[in-house]
Amino acid sequence: MIQAIKNMLGMGPSVDLKQLVKDGAIIVDVRTKGEYTGGHVKGAINIPLQVLGNNLGKLKKEKTIITCCASGMRSGSAKSLLKSKGYTVHNGGGWMSLQNKLR
């Protein structure tokens, strides 16, 4: 049941996000600018979900992308969008949880 929910959110099977970051993955925080300013994963770039589709030029397709947001819902939507455009992408879920995984 839990894995089914994770799949629905675009989180899929567990991957080593820490290793992906070490290997050069880009963290994209899709929360609003105000949310991002209130705290974010070190090194993450902020492209709010509402404008992500218009800002794909900021992301290189040869780089792995990890999306994050507050809870995993918006980052799941971002993952779906980016995947449909040919990006290699993983849903990191909520930013605080992702930050803990990267320590």
What spans do the regions from the language model cover?
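Short, surface-exposed ligand- or partner-binding patches at beta-edge/loop junctions that are enriched
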Residues: 68
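Rhodanese-like catalytic fold shared by cysteine-dependent sulfurtransferases
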Residues: 2-16, 23-25, 33-64, 73-103
